[in-house]
């Protein structure tokens, strides 16, 4: 399970694969295995240990892995210069936040994971589509290559900032709502309060490397950067996916009610 979702210490393959694979494959790998992995984990753990006499405190073990995963992912992301590797470590850190919800046993824990994964799909794919656009149009694969891009692609730069803000969990974005509901599980269940502190600290750490991209786009200059003709498919994909970060912030309650009802009807717990 840990290998599939890129949980520390089974994350070692993720940065190299993300950097070496075509970016379309990387975008797929950043989302699909996590959705499948958490679906299997929920079914396995909640079925195997529900009412079991086995003396295994698996929620505490998951909580420890959660703290390790988000911390290692964020710290290693700080020193990355390649955009795909940075997003790879960012992806690992987000697994840590989802594991946080998984460690709090209950129906709303499952709802929170589904809620987070749904929002993560849009915020992460929009960031990867922007990386794909930059690589194709400007051969820009490192953060320094993005210097001054806001002056050449102002619309896409704005939506990239929106995606990064959502990945960081800043309001008013869907990523903020997703993290609030993840942390809400801890405060309601009154379990692993230390893990909430770790999550908040890691959120602050992530701001640094997300802002490094924003800084390059808006506050650095590259006189040799030439404006390119945009790829219409990527252009509209970035706008559509990224705009959901605001749309779902405004209308998140209906989605939450639907997912909560769906989990209740599934009868896993």
What are these regions (language model features)?
Residues 1-269:
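Alpha-helical transmembrane segments of multi-pass membrane proteins predominantly involved
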């Amino acid at each position: 399970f840990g290998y599939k979702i890129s949980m520390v210490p089974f994350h070692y393959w993720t940065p190299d694969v993300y950097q070496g694979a075509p970016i379309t494959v990387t975008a797929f790998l950043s989302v699909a295995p996590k959705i499948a992995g958490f679906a299997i984990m929920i079914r396995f753990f909640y079925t195997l240990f529900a009412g079991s006499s086995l003396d295994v405190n698996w929620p505490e073990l998951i909580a420890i892995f959660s703290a390790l995963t988000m911390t290692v992912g964020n710290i290693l992301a700080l020193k990355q210069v390649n955009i795909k590797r940075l997003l790879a470590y960012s992806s690992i850190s987000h697994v840590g936040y989802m594991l946080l919800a998984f460690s709090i046993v209950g129906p709303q824990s499952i709802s929170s994971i589904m809620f987070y994964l749904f929002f993560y799909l849009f915020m992460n794919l929009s960031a990867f589509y922007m990386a794909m656009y930059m690589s194709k149009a400007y051969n820009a694969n490192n953060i320094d290559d993005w210097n001054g891009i806001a002056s050449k692609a102002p619309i896409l730069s704005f939506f990239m900032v929106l995606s990064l803000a959502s990945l960081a969990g800043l309001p008013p974005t869907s990523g903020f709502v997703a993290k609030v509901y993840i942390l809400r599980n801890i405060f309601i269940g009154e379990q692993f309060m230390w893990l909430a502190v770790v999550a908040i600290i890691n959120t602050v750490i992530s701001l640094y490397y997300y802002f490094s991209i924003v800084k390059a786009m808006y506050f650095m200059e590259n006189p040799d950067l030439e404006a390119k003709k945009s790829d219409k498919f990527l252009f509209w994909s970035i706008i559509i996916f990224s705009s959901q970060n605001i749309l779902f912030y405004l209308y998140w309650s209906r989605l939450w009610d639907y997912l909560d009802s769906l989990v209740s009807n599934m009868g896993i717990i």
